[in-house]
Amino acid sequence: MDAQQQALEVSAPYRLGLEIYYFREVVDEPIVSAVETVVHADAHIVVACKPHFLPVVPAGAYVRETLLTRLARRFDNAALVPLHRIDRDTAGLVLFSANPATRGIYQALFRERRIRKHYLAVAPPLPGLTFPYVHRSRLEPGEPFFRMRECVGEPNSETVIDVVARGVDTWTYRLEPVTGRKHQLRVHMAALGAPILHDRFYPELEDQRPDDPDRPLQLFAHTLAFDDPITGEPRSFTATVGPNN
C-alpha cells in the first residue's frame, strides 16, 4: 500500500521518496492466553497492565498477539501509540497516547525525565550492600544482538535500588531506573550478583524454550507517576500484578 492506503500494482513504477506499507504475516504465531487490564483511560491516554510474555508492539514472532493490537481493538482506536515499552517477559504498566493532537506533550514527560517509574523485582539477597544503593555503569549491545552487557567507560545507565521485603532465599527490591537503557534493570541486578528470578537472558543466556507460565520473570513495572501536562494535576497508577499475584 502507498501512503494513501491504496494497493500498489506489481507494474507500479519506481518513484523517489515513495512510502510503502505492508502487513507482515507470521506462521503459527504463539498465543498468549493471559489478559491485560486497563487501569485508566481518557481522551488522551490509556494505562494498561501487561501480563508476562505479551509483547507491547509487533516484533519477531508476534504480530497480532501484542498489547498494542489488543488495546487498539478494544478501544477501536488505530491512533494508539505506546509512549514507552517494557520487555515481553516483564509484566506491569505501560502508558499509551490515545490522541495524536496531545501525543507530543506526553512524550515530553519521558524525554525530559518528568515521569517517575518504579519496578518490583524478586532476586537473591545482597547483604553486603547499603540501601538505597545507586548502580551506574556503561551498557552496550552484547552477544547475541538482543542482549546487553556492562563495559568499561563513562556510565550511561543508572538505577536506584532499595529493599522492600527480605526473605530467606530471595528479597523483593524496588528499582527506580533513572535512565532507560534496554534491559537495564536486568543487567544491573545480574552484575551485582543478584539476577532477577527466572531471567532467561542474564547472567547467562538459557536455551530457547516455550514460555513457562509457572516461571515468569519476577520483574514488574509497578508504578507510574507524573504531573499531567494538560491539567497540571498529579497522576499516579499502580499495577494490578506483582510478586504476590
Question: Residue ranges of each PLM-predicted region?
Answer:
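RNA pseudouridine synthases
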Residues: 1-245
